[in-house]
Amino acid sequence: MDYPWHSQPLEALLARGDRLPHALLFRGREGIGKLALAEALARALLCESRQPMERACGRCVACMWMEQGSHPDFRRLEPDILSESRDPEEGTDRKPSLEIRIEQVRDISGFIAMTTHRNGPKVVLIHPAESLNVNAANALLKNLEEPPPRTHFLLVAHRWHQLPATIRSRCEQVVPAPPTIAMAREWLARQKLLDADLALAHAGGAPLLAVAFDEDYWRQREVLLKAITQPRFDALASAEAMRDTAPALVVSCLQKWASDLVRHKVTGEVGYNPDYAEVIAATAARLGLVEMVRYLRHLVGLQRIVAHPLNVRLFLEQLLLEYGALLRHAG
């Protein structure tokens, strides 16, 4: 899908024509459509009927193949868990990988070494690039250092700083700006999203995240925020109430809550949770800035392990006990 806020960055890339570098790293915040921008560029590079500086025509054979996911000169590299065409090995219980594995990169090495099918460029799209494991990243680096002619690597990363510096240095970085609030609101209105302003605020201005919040998400968020805003906060009872809630959601919501506490303490404003602005203001007034910043940094650090807690119940209890400790520091 193409998004209206991509018009300018896509046109700028297409205007470079043959001067486009062999490797681009699309980086930036999650939920603004970096992957869609990279896909639009891939379609344009492989289109056989477009004029210079124009987008893919959408009608030629190459465009039809891209629509069907079968273009012979295009490869998508992503973790098994994201692959729509994943075919589990017969007779195995192996879970789909969260990483891009070295075997996948080796397959790409064979692909780019072959003669092109359509006498045009080859395109490799890697998403999310930060999911490359160490061995896969090292194997990819060899391809980036000595790329075959007319081969384009398009890497997309939310947490680009997790990529090895050697890979980042081989790519020209593309940092698409998020849409303006007005543009995001207009787009969300066309998606028939209820309470678009709250969703957009909670998504930090990222419209694709805003539209992804479903009823179950809002219900679980409400359970969490009601629990932590009780006059007498009970961490263990709150953990029990959220026993079926994904730890990643709890950490994300708490991180946004803590960010709002810090923001209100410094600026008097609330970003992610405008529907709880009064409670945030009252809580921030009671807490010290140093303690709030320390707690926020702790939550940010938990993002690295939240996907695989050894014991979910204990993880939630510890998480909420730490918030209770923050409240006890109230001045």
Please identify what each model-predicted range represents.
Residues 68, 146, 193:
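Arginine/glycine-rich "motif VI" loop of SF2 helicases in the C-terminal RecA-like domain
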Residues 1-44, 52, 61, 149-152, ...:
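Charged, glycine-rich active-site and insertion segments that engage polyanionic ligands
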Residues 119-123, 148-154:
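Loop/turn-to-beta-strand initiation segments
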Residues 1-135:
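Clamp-loader machinery-focused feature within the broader ASCE/P-loop NTPase space
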